[in-house]
Amino acid sequence: MNITTIPNNCTHMVVKMTKNFDSAYMFYLLAKKIAEDDSLNPVIIPALISDSTHEAIEARVTGRVVEYMKAAFPNVNIDDTHQVRYDNTVDKNRSLRDSLVEQHQNSGVDMAQGWLSTIPDDSIVVMYNGDCEPLTDENFDAMEAHFGRSHDHIRALKGRPRINEMPWKSKGTTFPIYHSFINENMTRLEVYGEMKELGLNSLIDNTISCSMGDAEATNNYTQPCGVCYYCDEKAWIKLQHA
């Protein structure tokens, strides 16, 4: 996939990071584009969106990805990770989609204002969200049949609303958020395939695809649980690209 929506006057590029490989690939594509285009010279700001209960493992994964990018693209200006936390307070009796959207929007907007207030008002900021939609219905069905588990709570997230701009409160304006993979209807099945073709296996290995839901009960945040949607999705995707 080619990233083309980078304004030439962009000074600060925010990359929304999670512990999954799709956000790492978005980071890679942006850094590669900047490294190859002399007209672009923004600072890349990795912005980790983390559940407060999983913060340690997510920060560790993001740290590995940032180190990978700095080594791969030494001439690209990559800042330290900026953290946005939200509390894992999803009420199971509410719509999961509504709860998650509310958490991410409210916490993300409020906490982003801290670092936005530290950069000059004449900065040109853009943000890139590397999230993908869940698998297509056909592939979702095949994955569930393969593992014998249903993940209806993730199906409910398909097509959820996305924030397309971020308010910059201290400046009284907004800046755009690009959802490049979602706009191209890419799922992690296609992202994984592109990463393999580019030989980015070690980058994939630096990420973790897991909701870490079981980690709260076991107090083990060091390895995937093996039973959540994201674990099943990655295992099924690997089989498709074997």
Put a short name on every predicted segment:
Residues 1-242:
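Nucleotide-activated chemistry modules centered on ATP-dependent adenylation/adenylyltransferase
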